Design a protein with these regions (language model features):
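Conserved glycine-rich cofactor-binding loop
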Residues: 11-12
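The beta1-alpha1 cofactor-binding region of Rossmann-like NAD(H)/NADP(H)-dependent oxidoreductases
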Residues: 53-63, 94
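Substrate-binding pocket helix/loop in short-chain dehydrogenase/reductase
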Residues: 88-89, 96-98
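Active-site loop immediately N-terminal to the catalytic Tyr-X3-Lys motif
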Residues: 90, 137-144
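Active-site helix of classical SDR
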Residues: 112, 148
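Residue(s) in the substrate-gating loop at a strand-loop-helix junction
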Residues: 132
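SDR active-site lid
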Residues: 165-235
Length: 269
């Protein structure tokens, strides 16, 4: 029987690469995005159905979930939509805070709630959420983004206990740097004059060519997504990318405080 994956944030980057990979593997793919009218390629791929979905719109979430479930059982719900809010926390506007939480955290929760009755009734399925290495470690000037990603990791770990009796699995994929247009299309900056020098140092460290060379392509992380979906192990978090694996391994090995000292030296000097 053909399996189906529902993907949020499928217009670019990891979401798009995952949609193409699963379609290639013979899955039915429901690829969602805020502006489906601008998508001219995915809908032509055999097995891919494109739908509109803004994860900050509860009414549209309910409508899209109903339409997707009407097509048949959903084997995998892949919560992938998100963006980064970077810069000084003090400079963040209330609108920026609300938008970040609505998209990265509440959006995931609302989409999952919309699908849970169907998933629970069918008695099988996987809820997979893109977090980030930023959900396991922290870097300077990403505090609100980290709050959402750490929140998703904790939410997923707790939710797994609730849903296991119903045959449902809960997993996260935590990638490091991805060579995509995330930085240009999916990054919003706060501004505050008191932090400009420190922010400049941090951004320079993030942009360092040697550091960026350790990142992954969207296709490589999509492979990790597929592996996580197919894995039967009793495991929640799947760290993806050599840079992310190195960071997380080091944090576990040296402890939180020594790891923080290393991050401070790397990004702030």
């Amino acid at each position: 029987m053909t399996q189906t994956i529902f993907i949020t944030g499928a217009s670019t980057g990891l979401g798009r690469a995952t949609a193409l990979l699963f379609a290639q593997k013979g899955w039915k793919v429901i690829a969602t995005m805020r502006s489906p009218d601008k998508e001219t390629e995915l809908g032509k791929v055999p097995g891919i159905t494109v739908m509109g979905l803004d994860v900050t719109n509860p009414a549209q979430i309910a409508e899209t979930a109903k339409a997707a479930l009407a097509l048949g059982p959903i084997d995998v719900l892949f919560n992938n939509a998100g963006y980064g809010l970077a810069g000084a926390f003090e400079g963040a506007t209330d609108a920026q805070l609300v938008n970040q939480l609505n998209t990265n955290l509440l959006g995931v929760m609302r989409v999952t709630q919309a699908f849970l009755p169907g998933l629970r009734t069918q008695g099988y399925g996987t809820i997979l959420t893109t977090t980030s290495i930023g959900g396991l470690v922290a870097f300077p000037f990403n505090s609100v983004y980290h709050a959402t990603k750490w929140g998703l990791e904790g939410w997923s770990e707790s939710l797994a206990f609730e849903l296991e009796p119903f045959g449902l699995k809960v997993k996260t994929i935590a990638p490091g740097g991805i060579a995509t247009d995330f930085a240009s299309r999916s990054l919003v900056f706060t501004t505050h004059p008191a932090y400009m020098d420190a922010i400049a140092k941090t951004m320079a460290a993030f942009a360092d060519p040697e550091r960026r060379s350790n990142g992954s392509s969207a296709e490589q992380v999509a492979d990790a997504v597929y592996a996580a979906v197919m894995d039967d192990a009793d495991k929640i978090t799947y760290v993806a990318g050599e840079d992310a694996k190195a960071n997380y391994t080091q944090r576990l090995a040296v402890g939180i405080d020594k790891f923080r000292a290393g991050i401070k030296q790397m990004f702030l000097g």
